[in-house]
C-alpha cells in the first residue's frame, strides 16, 4: 500500500523493522538499507535501470534477503516544494511496485540529498570515478537516514 503522508507510512510499520530506501532516477536506482532497529541507513548498491520487471525483481531479491518491512522512495520535489515530472515518474514507479509487493511504500522529500552525498564523498577525498559509481546509493542512504530520524522523533512523541 502506498502512503502519501510520511506519518501514515510510519504508522503502518512494525516498531522494530528494517527498511529499504530508494533514490529513483532515470538511469539508476540507488539502494540503501536500514538496520533492524531502524537507527542507521547503509548504502547498498546502485541498480542500473533496464525494464521494470528486472528492476523490481532485483529489489524484491534485496528485500527478501534482508527481512525488509517497508519501502521508502525519495521524492524529488522542486526547490519550491512543487512536484514536477521526476516526482510523477517516482510515483508511477511506486504504483507499479505496489502491484508486486504488499509492503508499505512511503515517500521522503529528497531535495538536496544528492548534493549532500556528493559533498560527503568529496570530503572523504573520493575519486571522481568512484563518486560516479556510488553517488546514487549514498544519496539513497541520506534519504533513508532522514526518514529514520523523523520516524524516531514521531515514535518518541
UniProtKB/Swiss-Prot annotation:
Signal peptide: none annotated. It holds the Pfam family RuvX. Keywords: Cytoplasm, Hydrolase, Nuclease, Ribosome biogenesis. It is found in: Cytoplasm. One of its GO terms (molecular function) is nuclease activity. It comes from the Bacteria. GO terms for cellular component: cytosol. It is an enzyme of class 3 (hydrolase). Could be a nuclease involved in processing of the 5'-end of pre-16S rRNA. NCBIfam families: RNAse_H_YqgF (TIGR00250). This is Putative pre-16S rRNA nuclease. It comes from Ruegeria sp. (strain TM1040) (Silicibacter sp.).
Amino acid at each position: 500500500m502506498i502512503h502519501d503522508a510520511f506519518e501514515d507510512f510510519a504508522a503502518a510499520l512494525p516498531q522494530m523493522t528494517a527498511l529499504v530506501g530508494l533514490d529513483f532516477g532515470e538511469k539508476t536506482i540507488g539502494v540503501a538499507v536500514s538496520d533492524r532497529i531502524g537507527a542507521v541507513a547503509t548504502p547498498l548498491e546502485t541498480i542500473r535501470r533496464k525494464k521494470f520487471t528486472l528492476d523490481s525483481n532485483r529489489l524484491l531479491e534485496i528485500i527478501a534477503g534482508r527481512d525488509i518491512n517497508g519501502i521508502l522512495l525519495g521524492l524529488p520535489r522542486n526547490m519550491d516544494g512543487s512536484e514536477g515530472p521526476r516526482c510523477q515518474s517516482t510515483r508511477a514507479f511506486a504504483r507499479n511496485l505496489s502491484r508486486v509487493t504488499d509492503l508499505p511504500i512511503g515517500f521522503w522529500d529528497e531535495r538536496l540529498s544528492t548534493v549532500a552525498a556528493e559533498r560527503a564523498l568529496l570530503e572523504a577525498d573520493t575519486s571522481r570515478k568512484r563518486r560516479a559509481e556510488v553517488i546514487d546509493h549514498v544519496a539513497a542512504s541520506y534519504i533513508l537516514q532522514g526518514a529514520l530520524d523523523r520516524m524516531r522523533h514521531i515514535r518518541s512523541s
